[in-house]
């Protein structure tokens, strides 16, 4: 059972240049998730990323597939759903060609009207089954991310329903996406999905809505959360998503730096929050 100090320190980033990757390595960040907005995916220099990562010893751990209303794999309209899946498959091919094997995906866009939720869920499950098959043929895995608010996957039970369509689907646990309004705690999530969690998005929040604060700025009891993941056998990276610039939701809050990311990871169990 890997302890948190044995996990790699990682970051979700759009950086692909040699200088940025070298700086991350110098700061103890040895793995990365590539995450680029839907509007900018055509600008990704895939071969440059491969070469730069190899040159500095950076592992390209995962690729966060883009998310936008126009790339909604849960779209009830079949033509829109199929187009979204096709676009994601094309991006999987590009990342797979440089050795990326883990693909994080949002199971839906938002908002979802209550009376349409079942239709969105059916579309998402159809899409995830297709994507799981496509990824598996390329020795890769789809990592379904839990989401906040009215999005699909806002509870452990919805996540279980989503990934049940294919045994090869796995989970990206975004720890700041479980909103109190929907009644799912970190403990319940890890209890029900712990054996499927293969990657994470680490940031802090207030339990009301996502905030992407630097760990320690919000209310998460990190000691408790990390022990849940350790006990579940998690051995992926401590992968930051956000927290290195002012939060979109609360810009007045303090934030961390690339230089302090590794230290915060190594001392994370000292933070007991107010959970």
Give the location of each predicted region.
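Catalytic-core regions built around general acid/base machinery
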Residues: 46-57, 127-134, 188-192, 224-228
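Metal-dependent catalytic neighborhoods of phosphoester/phosphodiester hydrolases
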Residues: 43-46, 114-115, 249-251
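N-terminal pre-domain/capping segments
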Residues: 1-96, 170, 195, 255-275
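Residue-level detector of anion-binding/catalytic polar loops
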Residues: 30-31, 59, 101, 141, ...
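Active-site-proximal loop/turn and secondary-structure-junction residues that shape catalytic pockets
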Residues: 15-17, 36-38, 66-69, 109-111, ...
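Conserved beta-strand positions
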Residues: 11, 32-34, 105, 144, ...
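Histidine-acidic metal/acid-base catalytic patches
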Residues: 1-6, 15-25, 101, 153, ...
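Active-site acidic/histidine proton-transfer and metal-coordination neighborhood
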Residues: 55, 74-170, 180
């Amino acid at each position: 059972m890997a302890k948190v100090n044995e996990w790699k320190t990682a970051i979700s980033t759009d950086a692909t240049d040699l200088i940025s990757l070298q700086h991350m390595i110098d700061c103890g960040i040895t793995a990365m998730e590539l995450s680029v907005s839907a509007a900018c995916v055509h600008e990704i220099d895939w071969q440059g990323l491969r070469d730069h990562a190899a040159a500095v010893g950076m592992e390209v751990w995962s690729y966060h597939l883009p998310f936008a209303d126009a790339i909604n794999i849960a779209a009830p309209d079949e033509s829109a759903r199929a187009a979204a899946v096709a676009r994601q498959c094309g991006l999987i091919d590009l990342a797979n060609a440089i050795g990326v094997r883990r693909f994080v995906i949002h199971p839906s866009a938002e908002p979802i009207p209550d009376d349409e939720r079942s239709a969105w869920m059916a579309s998402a499950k159809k899409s995830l089954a297709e994507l799981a098959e496509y990824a598996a043929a390329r020795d890769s895995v789809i990592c379904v991310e839990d989401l906040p608010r009215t999005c699909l996957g806002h509870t452990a039970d919805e996540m279980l329903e989503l990934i049940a369509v294919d045994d090869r689907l796995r989970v990206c646990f975004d720890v700041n996406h479980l909103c109190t309004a929907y009644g799912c705690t970190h403990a319940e999530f890890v209890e029900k999905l712990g054996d499927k969690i293969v990657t994470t998005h680490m940031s802090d929040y207030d339990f009301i809505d996502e905030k992407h604060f630097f760990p320690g700025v919000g209310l998460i009891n990190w000691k408790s959360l990390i022990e849940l993941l350790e006990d579940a056998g998690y051995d992926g990276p401590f992968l930051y998503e956000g927290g290195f610039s002012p939060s979109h939701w609360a810009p007045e809050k303090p934030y961390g730096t690339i230089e302090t990311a590794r230290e915060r990871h190594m001392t994370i169990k000292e933070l007991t929050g107010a959970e």
